[in-house]
Regions:
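Hydrophobic/aromatic side-chain positions at a characteristic register within alpha-helices
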Residues: 5-6, 89, 96, 113
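Helix-turn-helix repeat elements of alpha-solenoid scaffolds
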Residues: 5-19, 51-65, 97-105, 148-154
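Canonical positions in the second alpha-helix
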Residues: 20, 68-71, 110-111, 159-162
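Extended HEAT/HEAT-like alpha-solenoid repeat tracts in very large eukaryotic scaffold/adaptor proteins
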Residues: 36-44, 59, 151-155
Length: 216
């Protein structure tokens, strides 16, 4: 499959993949976990996009179900949870059902309860929460805040508890989001209408312009 993909023969690769996925789906958890852990740790490594290497049906029939099963089978091992949240986020939301509040965060909090001192889990949850803060703030340069201020204040507190080291880069980035969050609250209580101008008047570093991807 990988060789055919590399040669650009996607259709032929998919023909090879289906029987492999079908046979692997029938294997015991131990065999499937050996394959999935190798796939996530070695093949995907630092890749951001997983779809080309983990397409359907391998994704839905083998990889994601195995990660959920392994998570239940060995609650003390955080790898399955971290890979689910980091690599298969859409499937985490789908499994939780429509309207479920923050399924990735809840999975990580459950994992943290089983392994409270695991640095990787703490950082993964902090990174997830930071992503929410950043996403909710990415239109501040247009004087718009997309998130729930009170909820994001609680998320900021949670990040601080997860990362007590104030020099941690994730903590530093979170404190910057916190500064913007508090500035936004003060701005909303003022009579001004332009957040960037308000920041300039109050010696607050203004938010970066984040709407560039809407251009063109």
């Amino acid at each position: 499959f990988a060789d055919l993909q590399k040669r650009g023969l996607r259709k032929e690769a998919m023909v090879q993949l289906r029987p492999f996925a079908d046979s692997l789906a029938d294997q015991a958890l131990a065999q499937r976990w050996a394959f999935v852990s190798w796939l996530c740790s070695e093949v995907l490594a630092e890749r951001v996009v997983t779809q080309p290497l983990v397409p359907m049906p391998l994704r839905s029939a083998v990889v994601v179900p195995t990660l959920f099963e392994q998570r239940d089978a060995d609650p003390g091992d955080p790898r399955a949870t971290i890979w689910l949240v980091g690599r298969f986020t859409a499937e985490v939301y789908e499994a939780a059902g429509p309207g479920a509040p923050d399924p990735p965060g809840n999975l990580l909090r459950e994992q943290l309860a089983n392994s409270p001192d695991d640095v990787a889990v703490r950082q993964c949850l902090a990174r997830h929460l930071l992503g929410i803060l950043e996403d909710d703030a990415h239109h501040l340069s247009e004087s718009r805040y997309l998130g729930d201020v009170d909820l994001n204040e609680r998320r900021l507190i949670e990040i601080r508890e997860l990362l007590p080291d104030s020099d941690d880069p994730l903590r530093t980035a979170a404190e910057r989001e916190g500064q913007l969050l508090y500035a936004w609250q003060e701005f909303c209580a003022s009579a001004e209408t332009d957040f960037n101008s308000w920041c300039a008047h109050h010696n607050v570093e203004p938010p970066a312009g984040n709407a560039y991807y809407y251009e063109n």
